[in-house]
């Protein structure tokens, strides 16, 4: 019996672990709950009709993009319904199952499929019961699975699922609180404390456009995109966080304005929670060459290429994409290209270089050799700036790009 089951598994037939009953989880949810919440809270109540229509269209696109990306990556095995519920055909995807899947992926990353084939197969089977995905039905598909969907992409997918589930649970909890509360809408707890305001000040728009045009690389595919709209980010940080940022800026100095690119399907989560420092794992995701930090660039199309999907072609190209413009406290910056950096790494035999004690950030220069987080030497085409403390970041604008009319 076990032999027959294993033979089926090798051909791509998998059981799926049912986490819970969809109907019971969805009992308090309502259609378009996620979209309605995002539109209600992200759009200022005093916005004019044209601005509301523009922002509603933007938010609708961000919600549907996340839905489409999760369905597409999983081959349709995982869907997000209109309420925001993340589900499979037989159950829902819970935070518990995602956390268990991450542990299983960690185990898989340390196994050699050729040396530990049975253990690898069992672990991969367990992973795909937790996070169902369409697989190749040909014999030996398990040998090629992580060539099709790399470990780094799987870690990113788990991160996306986790944020989607957390958002659904927060919105559902808010709905239940609102039903039992007598407070007015203004006093109700919010899922999104952020609001997006369309910038109409020509001086501000022209300044941002010039900063983009003056620092773009014509060799980048995204250099053909144009700045379409600029949205001011209001309320993402509370008063305490803003005061702390200003205090830190005075203490450390060297505050710079940099670009940060992110895929469209990540934007709602960032507008809800701010930027995060991705969890460490055995594999670098895009742009993790200099340690676990938040990556920025002064070269606009370096960041926009990431937003567009140039560095991540496996998940599609978005020609209508976005970048954040942020104030970043660089303070005392460590130059990864400095000759001393290589000597320091060799002398200490470090394999995990960044962050460097006594420094507030790292600058990796394009066109020269830099010491990476693993102690290797690499050459970059573009400048990258990395900070390791979220308190050093203040997102100011969400900038929309596309081909225009």
Q: What role is predicted for each listed range?
A:
Residues 5, 62, 108, 124, ...:
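Alpha-helix boundary/capping residues
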Residues 150-290:
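Internal glycine-rich, Lys/Arg-flanked active-site/core loops of soluble domains
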Residues 13-193:
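Eukaryotic extended interaction platforms
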Residues 44, 94, 147, 201-202, ...:
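Helix N-terminus capping/helix-initiation residues
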Residues 78-80, 86, 93, 143, ...:
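Hydrophobic transmembrane signal anchors and adjacent membrane-proximal interface regions, especially
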Residues 3-14, 176, 195-197, 243-405:
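Segments that shape or occlude catalytic/ligand-binding pockets
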Residues 8, 57, 61, 211, ...:
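Residues that form generic nucleotide/phosphate-binding pockets
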């Amino acid at each position: 019996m076990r032999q027959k089951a294993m033979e089926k598994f090798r051909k791509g037939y998998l059981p799926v672990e049912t986490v819970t009953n969809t109907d019971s989880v969805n009992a308090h949810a309502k259609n378009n709950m996620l979209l309605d919440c995002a539109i209600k809270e992200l759009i200022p109540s005093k916005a004019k009709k044209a601005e509301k229509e523009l922002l509603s269209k933007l938010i609708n696109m961000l919600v549907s993009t996340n839905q489409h990306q999760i369905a597409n990556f999983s081959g349709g095995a995982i869907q997000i319904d209109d309420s925001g519920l993340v589900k499979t055909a037989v159950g829902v995807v819970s935070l518990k199952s995602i956390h268990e899947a991450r542990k299983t992926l960690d185990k898989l990353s340390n196994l050699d499929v050729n040396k530990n084939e049975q253990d690898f197969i069992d672990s991969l089977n367990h992973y795909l019961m937790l996070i169902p995905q369409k697989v190749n039905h040909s014999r030996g598909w398990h040998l090629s699975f992580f060539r099709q969907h790399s470990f780094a992409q799987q870690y990113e997918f788990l991160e996306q699922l986790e944020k989607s589930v957390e958002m659904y649970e927060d919105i559902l909890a808010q709905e239940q609180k609102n039903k039992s509360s007598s407070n007015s809408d203004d006093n109700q707890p919010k899922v999104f404390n952020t609001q997006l305001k369309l910038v109409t000040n020509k001086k501000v728009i022209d300044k941002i456009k010039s900063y983009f045009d003056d620092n773009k690389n014509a060799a980048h595919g995204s250099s053909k995109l144009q700045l379409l709209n600029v949205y001011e980010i209001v309320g993402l940080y509370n008063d305490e966080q803003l005061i702390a940022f200003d205090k830190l800026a005075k203490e450390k100095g060297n505050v710079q304005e940099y670009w940060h690119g992110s895929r469209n399907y990540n934007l709602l989560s960032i507008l809800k929670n701010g930027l995060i420092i991705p969890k460490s794992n055995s594999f670098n995701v895009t742009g993790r060459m200099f340690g676990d930090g938040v990556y920025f660039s002064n070269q606009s199309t370096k960041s926009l290429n990431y937003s567009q999907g140039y560095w991540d072609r496996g998940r599609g190209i978005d020609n209508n994409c976005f970048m954040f413009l942020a104030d970043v406290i660089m303070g005392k910056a460590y130059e990864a290209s400095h000759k001393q950096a290589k000597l320091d790494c060799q002398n200490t035999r470090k394999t995990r270089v960044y962050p460097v004690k006594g420094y507030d950030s790292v600058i990796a220069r394009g066109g020269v050799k830099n010491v990476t987080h693993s102690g290797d030497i690499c050459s970059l085409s573009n400048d990258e700036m990395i900070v390791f403390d979220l308190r050093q970041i203040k997102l100011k604008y969400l900038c929309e790009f596309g081909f225009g009319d």
